Design a protein with these regions (language model features):
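Conserved thiamine diphosphate
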Residues: 1-86, 111
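Thiamine diphosphate
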Residues: 5-6, 57-195
Length: 195
């Protein structure tokens, strides 16, 4: 889904899948970061009840997790600890966000990177604790700005901790043909855009 469809173009480049599926009652939605996480998630999800959707990266996914990684159902992962800003990313955008975290660190900005592995249900506790600590948040997703991670985080904050949310997302556009790196640039999803 998303830009990992690359040269298959718009017919394979779903930027609205999460938004559509979030509206289905009892649906659980995972946005996997890399192959290691996909493998771990499938092993656990097979033993759960109810409908699940796993958004799986294609061959272009940059590895984030190693073989010692342990996936926890419906939990976000804190990838880096920080005090100045919270970056909540999902799927392939976790790797891009990690690059941005390193650039910010060079400037003395401490970013906490959270991998929102589950978009529905959202791990509100982990995400909210981080946002309350930093008081600044940006979401990063390989999905339409409408109905995905940005929407889920914003909906939570409206009720629990009103705060402006910055976003890196596909800005209400359709997919198109291109190489992974070209599409990252075209849709403004690069680590430089996050930075």
């Amino acid at each position: 889904p998303g830009i990992t469809a690359e040269l298959n173009g718009g017919t394979h480049m779903s930027f609205e899948d999460i938004a559509t599926l979030r509206s289905i009652p009892t649906m659980t939605i995972y946005d996997a970061v890399d192959d290691t996480q996909v493998y771990q998630a499938i092993k656990q999800i097979m033993n759960t009840d109810g409908p699940c959707y796993i958004r799986m990266p294609r061959k272009t996914a940059q590895p984030v997790y190693d073989e010692n990684y342990k996936f926890a159902l419906n939990k976000a992962d804190v990838i880096t600890k920080g005090n100045d800003i919270t970056i909540v990313a999902s799927g392939i955008m976790v790797a891009e966000s990690l690059k941005a975290v390193l650039k910010l660190k060079e400037e003395g900005i401490s970013a906490e990177l959270i991998s929102a592995n589950t978009i529905k249900p959202l791990d509100e506790e982990t995400i909210l604790n981080s946002i309350k600590k930093t008081n600044h948040v940006v979401t990063c997703e390989n999905h339409n700005v409408i109905g995905g991670l940005y929407s889920a985080v914003s909906e939570m904050l409206i009720e629990k901790y009103p705060l402006h949310v910055d976003k890196i997302a596909v800005m209400d556009q359709f997919g198109q043909v291109g190489k992974y790196s070209e599409l990252l640039n075209y849709y403004h999803l690069t680590s430089n855009d996050i930075y």
